């Protein structure tokens, strides 16, 4: 974390990142616990939505988030946009709750029973392999490689699910199996207009390509190291906990903004049966998405409206967080801003 040259800086209890910044074991514990919290939310909220789901009302008009995504994956025996077999959704929700407990227990175990610093383990041991320093590009790229491989495997799982189980096709109005279209020309051409994609085969082809690309990239990052000396030209002095946090916030913010625009207008991936009609982008004090369905009651909103607007504003603030932490990582002291305003208030003009 940025300390501005103060070696004995202290942090308040709510500065959670400070507790893991220089302790790789605690960092893993926080990762596991965080993943457990996300899985707990997904499982608990799915059960909550199932309890209040009304099959007589369009799913997109019930302010649901989890169930529309499960329905889009062809789960729930969907007929005419209605869940007819909620058992599958219940199983998935309960599994998420169970795994959230496992991950939470793992976080507690790593935090209380195992060493807070993986560097204290013997050389050659598996924990030692994942010990890292924020300014060590070789170890960071080694860990990045493992992340990329897991993302690639997740893409493979999605592609195989669509190919053998099937996902919802809004054009057909039914769940069907989808084979991936691995046309590299199509993938290249959709770089700029992927928000307008209308073919599920193309969607799966993009995920299949990503799976291959991420796994190859992951293997590359695991087995390779810096070529030559690590110099300032290559970025020496720029890597730090704060810098990596800023990169992460930028990535999450970008993904959130893409999700906002994609979910607001695309009906191939976000079907109208589950998310409601497409939205219109408007500008006031800030940009926002509005519903276009005239049948909605006053003050009511579709799941698409909630999804797009929440992602848009979260993405916006994530980008602001990226800029904040990136500037701090570069050495900018925001305390100077307050001092500048104080100096302006205390400044006096004298007549010579």
From Swiss-Prot:
Top-level taxon of the source organism: Bacteria
Which controlled-vocabulary keywords does the entry list?
Chlorophyll, Chromophore, Membrane, Photosynthesis, Photosystem I, Photosystem II, Thylakoid, Transmembrane, Transmembrane helix
Nuclease is among the record's keywords: no
Name its cellular compartments. Cellular thylakoid membrane
GO MF annotations, alphabetized? chlorophyll binding
A cellular-component GO term for this protein:
photosystem II
tRNA processing among the record's keywords? no
**Required cofactor names:** divinyl chlorophyll a; divinyl chlorophyll b
Q: How does it sit in the membrane?
A: Multi-pass membrane protein
InterPro entries named among the record's database cross-references: PS_antenna-like, PS_II_antenna-like_sf
User: Which residues are listed as membrane-spanning?
Assistant: 27-47, 89-109, 142-162, 203-223, 243-263, 307-327
The remark listed among the other comments is: This low-light-adapted strain contains 7 pcb genes.
Q: What does the UniProt record say this protein does?
A: The antenna complex functions as a light receptor, it captures and delivers excitation energy to photosystems II and I. The Prochlorales pcb genes are not related to higher plant LHCs.
Q: Which NCBIfam families match?
A: PS_antenn_a_b
Family, per entry: Belongs to the PsbB/PsbC family. IsiA/Pcb subfamily.
What is this protein's name?
Divinyl chlorophyll a/b light-harvesting protein PcbB
In its UniProt entry, the species of origin is given as Prochlorococcus marinus (strain NATL2A)
Q: Which gene encodes it?
A: pcbB
């Amino acid at each position: 974390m940025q300390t501005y040259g103060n070696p004995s800086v202290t942090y308040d209890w709510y500065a959670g990142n400070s507790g893991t910044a220089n302790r790789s074991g605690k960092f893993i514990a926080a990762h596991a616990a965080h993943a457990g919290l996300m899985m707990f939310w997904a499982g608990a909220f799915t059960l909550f939505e199932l309890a209040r789901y009304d099959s007589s009302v369009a799913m997109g008009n019930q302010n649901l988030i989890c169930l529309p995504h499960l329905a889009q994956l062809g789960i729930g025996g969907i007929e005419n946009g209605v869940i007819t077999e909620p058992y599958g959704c219940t199983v998935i929700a309960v599994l998420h709750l169970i795994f959230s407990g496992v991950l939470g227990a793992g976080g507690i175990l790593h935090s209380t029973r195992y060493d807070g610093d993986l560097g204290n383990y013997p050389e050659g041991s598996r924990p030692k392999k994942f010990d890292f320093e924020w300014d060590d590009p070789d170890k960071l790229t080694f860990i990045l490689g493992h992340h990329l491989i897991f993302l690639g495997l997740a893409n493979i799982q999605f592609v195989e699910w669509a190919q053998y189980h099937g996902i919802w096709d809004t054009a057909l109005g039914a769940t069907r199996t989808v084979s991936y279209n691995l046309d590299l020309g199509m993938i290249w051409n959709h770089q700029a207009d992927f928000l307008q994609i209308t073919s599920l085969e193309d969607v799966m082809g993009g995920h299949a390509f990503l799976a291959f690309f991420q796994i190859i990239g992951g293997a590359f990052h695991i087995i390779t190291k810096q070529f030559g000396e690590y110099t300032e030209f290559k970025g020496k002095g720029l890597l730090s906990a704060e810098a990596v946090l800023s990169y992460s916030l930028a990535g999450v913010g970008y993904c959130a903004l893409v999700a906002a625009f994609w979910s607001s207008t695309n009906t191939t991936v976000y079907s109208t049966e589950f998310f409601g009609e497409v939205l219109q982008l408007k500008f006031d004090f800030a940009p926002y998405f509005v519903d276009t369905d005239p049948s909605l009651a006053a003050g009511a909103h579709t799941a698409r409206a909630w999804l797009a607007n929440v992602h848009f504003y979260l993405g916006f603030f994530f980008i602001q967080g990226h800029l904040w932490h990136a500037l701090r990582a570069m050495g900018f002291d925001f305390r100077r801003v307050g001092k500048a305003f104080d100096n302006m208030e205390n400044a006096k003009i004298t007549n010579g």
